[in-house]
Amino acid sequence: MMNIDGILKVLPGVKEPKAAVPFNKRLMWTFTGLLIFLLMGQIPVAGTAPAIFERLQAIQMILGSKIGTLATLGIGPIVMASIILQLLVGSGIISWDLNSWEGRARFIGVQKLLAFFFCFFEAAAWVLSGALTPKLPHLALLLIFQLAIGGIIILFLDELISKWGIGSGVSLFIAAGVSQAIFIRLFSWYSINQMPAGEVPRLLFALTTGNLQLAAQALIPILSTILVFLLVVYANGIKVEIPLAFASFKGFGRRWPLNFF
C-alpha cells in the first residue's frame, strides 16, 4: 500500500482551490471546460480511415463521446474506474475506511490511477477490435496514443469542473452530448435526398409543400421530445415526505421531504 501511496503522490492533477471560489469564476471554469470538451468532439484523430458510426450513436450519448475524434472515449474510463473500485470497496475485497480523510483520499487517487489505465486500455480496444481502423497498419499505435490522450484530457476537465466549476464534469458532459444530439436532430438544415434532416425543418418543408403525411411523421418526434422533457421535469420535482418521530421528545414529530428520483 505504501507503494501505491507513493505513486498517487506523483500523479498529475488539478490543484485544489485554497479559498472559496466565487460564483462567476465557477461559471467561467465550467463554461471553459465544456467548451474544450465540445471542441475535442470536432477534432478528428489523425490516421484513421473514414467510417460511418451510426450504429454507435446510443453509445456516444451515454458516454458523452464523439467517435472518431479526440473525445472518442468520452467519460468511459472515468465511469469504469469508479464502478470497479466501488465494487471492490463495497464488497470488502479492499478494506478502506471511506469515513476517514485518508481513506477517501486514497479512494480518489486510486480511482484516478485506474482511469489513466482505462484510457489506454479502452483506446487499444477501440483500435484492435476494428471499431476504429487506421489508414495504414503501422499507424495503429499513433491512433491508440491519440485516443488515450483525449481520454486523459477529459479526465482533467472533469477534475477541473468538480473542483473549480459547478457540479460534476461527468454529468455535464453527458448532458452536453444528449443536448447536442437532440438539437441537431431537431434543427439540422442539412439536406438528405433534397429533404432537411432535422425534424423542425422537415416539418416546415412538409407544410410548405402540402405533404401532410410527412408533416405528421416530423411532428411526432417533436411532440415526443417535448412530452419526455416535461415528464422528466415533473418527476424531478416529486418529493416523498418521510414521517420522523423522536423518542426523546414524545409527541414531537416532523416530515422529511426526499426527492422521489
Please tell me what each predicted stretch does.
Residues 1-260:
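Core subunits and conserved enzymes of cellular information-processing
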